[in-house]
Amino acid sequence: MTSSAAAAIKQALGAYGETLAARHLVGQGMVLLERNWRCEAGEIDLVLRDGDVLVVCEVKTRSSLRYGTPHEAVTDIKVARLRRLASRWVQDRGVAVRDIRIDLVGIVRPRRGSSVVDHVRGIG
């Protein structure tokens, strides 16, 4: 497999995971505000509202656990970056928020069987 083919597969898996995560969170009563918001400092996968709390959600999707769980891929450095990006999103959009929460949705999509979705609230 070429590196461009591998990159395309990885990108498709990520897009699948973000769509599945968004559906799951909206099904839990959250309101999706934005997907894949970017600035020069980075990207937020999903921005949602959960009541009066702004939720910035990192989505990690894996096709296997060979390289660890989706949760293991989110370091303290990544959480700190998401906090900074959340503040930047609020400033950029000019919205007032009472609180900001960072969530993680980890998805494992095996070759056979159903995907497993694990939502962790307040990772940092």
Swiss-Prot record:
One term of GO molecular function: nucleic acid binding
InterPro entries: Restrct_endonuc-II-like, tRNA_endonuc-like_dom_sf, UPF0102_YraN-like
PANTHER family: UPF0102 PROTEIN YRAN (PTHR34039:SF1)
Membership in a protein family: Belongs to the UPF0102 family.
The protein's name in its UniProt record: UPF0102 protein Noca_3248
